[in-house]
């Protein structure tokens, strides 16, 4: 595994690490070894705004799965996310983020409320607890008004890019 990616992990903010950990934890629930299967990995990365192709995903897994377990622990996952962030260059464009915001904002009122967030996260097909959803809402809702406006959404997405 490239040391450059390991070094880049050290540059992640605590907030970025916490957001990655929250997404990782959603998928690791019930796993006895604290790792997620490579199958689940694509879902986690998509949830965090990354969209690797199956080939890119396999290539990343081959690089970070140092112990050959076929699963990815959190440290390996962080290295993967950093690599994906670097490969993604500047991340999502403003237009892509605007489209994503509109997908979440089902009633088109300019805000993402808890119910809209829950609907979108449950659409991933994974079992997500109310606590997980509320934690994500809390992370995104900087002014604590119970909903995420577009500026808060952009700020939140910067953290996951």
Curated annotation (Swiss-Prot):
GO terms for biological process, alphabetical: cardiac muscle contraction; skeletal muscle contraction
Protein residues bound to Ca(2+) 1: 65, 67, 69, 71, 76
Protein family according to the UniProt entry: Belongs to the troponin C family.
Gene this protein is translated from: TNNC1
SMART domains xrefs: EFh
Domain EF-hand: from-to ranges: 16-51, 52-87, 92-127, 128-161
Top-level division of the source organism's lineage: Eukaryota
Binding site for Ca(2+) 3: 141, 143, 145, 147, 152
Record-level Gene Ontology MF annotations: calcium ion binding; calcium-dependent protein binding; troponin I binding
Keywords for this protein: Acetylation, Calcium, Metal-binding, Muscle protein, Repeat
Any GO CC annotation of this UniProt entry: cardiac Troponin complex
Modification N-acetylmethionine occurs at: 1
InterPro entries (alphabetical): CALM/Myosin/TropC-like, EF-hand-dom_pair, EF_Hand_1_Ca_BS, EF_hand_dom
Described purpose of this protein according to its UniProt entry: Troponin is the central regulatory protein of striated muscle contraction. Tn consists of three components: Tn-I which is the inhibitor of actomyosin ATPase, Tn-T which contains the binding site for tropomyosin and Tn-C. The binding of calcium to Tn-C abolishes the inhibitory action of Tn on actin filaments.
Other notes: Slow skeletal muscle Tn-C can bind 3 calcium ions per molecule. Domain I does not bind calcium.
Name of the molecule in the record: Troponin C, slow skeletal and cardiac muscles
Record-linked Pfam families: EF-hand_7 (PF13499), EF-hand_8 (PF13833)
UniProt binding sites for Ca(2+) 2: 105, 107, 109, 111, 116
Organism, as annotated: Gallus gallus (Chicken)
